[in-house]
A protein has these predicted regions:
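Cationic, low-complexity basic patches in intrinsically disordered or flexible, solvent-exposed regions
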Residues: 4-7, 19
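Phosphate- and other anionic-substrate recognition elements at nucleic-acid/protein interfaces
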Residues: 22-49, 54, 59-186
Length: 186
């Protein structure tokens, strides 16, 4: 099954003829926000990920890294299937970096959900050359749910869109921080 997923991944990423061998590429694929920006090629954009136990919310930035928009919610089945869909969308939308929501506890510690997000990123980097960064996603789903409630969105519609909107919320936070960093640069 892993070989089948690897073949699909190699086919969906342009200019990728084989997956990286060994562990030399590990840890180098996880970047700071600034490094992720520097690694971006012209015309590429970022994809935000909100990792849940049952779903993965996805969002896209525009090519100017100004605005994040909800894209899709993947219903999780197994890692290889989930990543194959993720990388298919990454190739389609010319993704140059992933912004992965890191669910840090309110006191700043990392619990099981944050460890799960880090494990997902480690496994993803074994299959993809696309760099990633983490973004503190504390309260992102709660903020989106509150916004949807304020907009009088039905329960069914909220359930349908909350994950991809949370991914957009996460990505937008990272984009705004990037702008802040760039504004302070000499």
């Amino acid at each position: 099954m892993r070989e089948q997923a690897e073949r699909l991944i190699v086919r969906t990423i342009p200019n990728l003829t084989e997956l990286p061998k060994g562990n030399s590429h590990l840890t180098s694929n996880i970047k700071t926000l600034g490094e992720l920006r520097e690694a971006l090629k012209k015309g590429q954009r970022w994809m935000g990920l909100d990792l849940g136990s049952k779903t993965i919310g996805l969002s896209l930035s525009d090519v100017t890294l100004t605005v994040a928009s909800p894209l899709e919610t993947i219903r999780r089945t197994k890692f290889s299937t989930d990543v194959a869909r993720l990388l298919e969308l990454a190739a389609k939308h010319e993704i140059g970096g992933f912004v992965i929501g890191l669910p840090v506890n309110m006191d700043g510690t990392e619990g099981p959900a944050a460890q799960s997000a880090r494990a997902f990123a480690r496994n993803l980097e074994k299959l993809s050359p696309i760099p990633a960064t983490f973004w503190d996603e504390r309260m992102s789903t709660a903020a989106v749910t509150r916004t949807l409630l304020d907009a009088d969105t039905s329960r069914a519609r909220r359930a349908e869109v909350v994950d991809k909107m949370a991914a957009a919320y996460i990505l937008q936070g990272a984009l705004e921080r990037l702008r802040s960093i760039q504004a302070k640069a000499p």
